[in-house]
Design a protein with these regions (language model features):
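Receiver (REC) domain active-site loop signature in two-component systems and cognate sites
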Residues: 57
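CheY-like receiver
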Residues: 121-150
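C-terminal output helix
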Residues: 106-119
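Short amphipathic alpha-helix used as the core "switch/output" element in two-component signaling
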Residues: 41, 63-75
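Two-component/phosphorelay signaling modules centered on CheY-like receiver
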Residues: 13-31
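Helix N-cap/capping motif at the beta->alpha junctions
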Residues: 32-41, 62
């Protein structure tokens, strides 16, 4: 699991600090952002595999942040973090490309489990891309080049 790097995005700094400490104890590499725009700026510099993203934030909310992440970094897996009142937003997030969602407050083991599943999904996709890119187009030995000058 030490390969996986998570970004937590939430405007509640106490939640970020507590969750970051709990994840660090489990050996997870974590960075934090307190807004969607801060998250996007950090993603420019950081190689993040999974983003755990709060739906309800002032300014750029979770849905707008999700759209921007998926547009710029389609391989990053995003897990929406939501309260009971914003389950509809989590469903909207799933429709827009989020991998999963978690209800607040969430159990740290459930959070880690969902992050590991998302990371595994990304690794499979990266492998498929690598295999596809390594294939070379082979021409049939029976293929005869056409003379286009007639």
């Amino acid at each position: 699991m030490s390969e996986m790097k998570i970004m937590l995005v939430d405007d509640e700094e106490r939640f970020l600090t507590t969750t970051q400490k709990l994840l660090a104890r489990k050996g997870v590499d974590v960075i934090t952002a307190t807004s969607g725009s801060e998250a996007l700026n950090k993603l420019i510099m950081e190689n993040v595999h999974v983003v755990i993203l709060d739906v309800k934030m002032p300014g750029m909310d979770g849905i707008a942040t999700l759209k921007a992440i998926k547009e710029r970094y389609p391989l990053i897996e995003v897990i929406m973090l939501t309260g009971h009142a914003t389950v509809e937003s989590a469903v909207e997030g799933l429709k827009l490309g989020a991998t999963d969602y978690l209800m607040k407050p969430s159990d740290i083991d459930e959070l880690v489990g969902k992050a590991e599943e998302a990371y595994a999904k990304r690794k499979v996709l990266e492998e498929k891309i690598r295999v596809a890119q390594s294939r070379t187009v082979q021409k049939s030995p029976l293929e005869i080049p056409r003379d286009t000058k007639r």
